[in-house]
Amino acid sequence: MSRYRGPRLKKIRRLGALPGLTRKTPKSGSNLKKKFHSGKKEQYRIRLQEKQKLRFHYGLTERQLLRYVHIAGKAKRSTGQVLLQLLEMRLDNILFRLGMASTIPGARQLVNHRHILVNGRIVNIPSFRCKPRDIITTKDNQRSKGLVQTLMASSDPGKLPKHLTIDTLEYKGLVNKILDRKWVGLKINELLVVEY
């Protein structure tokens, strides 16, 4: 399967809030269609929805998600927690968390267009895995700084996770440590994704 490029609000109505996919929210009364199926959900459907939440939030293909599950399965710790840590330490997600991009697809575009430096080197791979003590900055040119400047001014510093720090004057972010589970901004049961 390729990356999803269709209407985002349809996915949000079906799966719930996905802050990495879009800032938009559905209208409160828009999902009042009468559903005639029973209230009981099958286990397969629940697991599939959790997997789709993860895929659409982080902007992954099916193959990428399977690769991350495989890597997390080899770890000695909890597979679900390691999976979330791997996904949260991706460069595109860290840019989104720092407030340098409004959504994860927007962060992917910044990385693909070579506006982002990691430890002084240009990185154009959105799935680049950041490590603790990595310094993430923009290029020195005015265009790159202008793209990030407006977004950083409008972002709320109180929402910044504890594993990241940001210097808004120099447009610089620092990865302090690997993320804790409680700072993941998505309501998801990661064990159901691993079971799927």
UniProtKB/Swiss-Prot annotation:
Its main location: plastid. Transmembrane segments: none annotated. Keywords: Chloroplast, Plastid, Ribonucleoprotein, Ribosomal protein, RNA-binding, rRNA-binding. GO terms for cellular component: chloroplast; small ribosomal subunit. InterPro entries: Ribosomal_uS4 (IPR022801), Ribosomal_uS4_bac-type (IPR005709), Ribosomal_uS4_CS (IPR018079), Ribosomal_uS4_N (IPR001912), S4_RNA-bd (IPR002942), S4_RNA-bd_sf (IPR036986). GO terms for biological process: ribosomal small subunit biogenesis; translation. It is found in: Plastid, Chloroplast. Signal peptide: none annotated. GO terms for molecular function: rRNA binding; structural constituent of ribosome. Residues 89-169 form the S4 RNA-binding domain. The keyword Protease does not apply. Pfam families: Ribosomal_S4, S4. The keyword Disulfide bond does not apply. Residues 17-36 are annotated as: Disordered. It comes from the Eukaryota. HAMAP family: Ribosomal_uS4_B. Part of the 30S ribosomal subunit. Contacts protein S5. The interaction surface between S4 and S5 is involved in control of translational fidelity. One of the primary rRNA binding proteins, it binds directly to 16S rRNA where it nucleates assembly of the body of the 30S subunit. Belongs to the universal ribosomal protein uS4 family. This is Small ribosomal subunit protein uS4c. The gene is rps4.
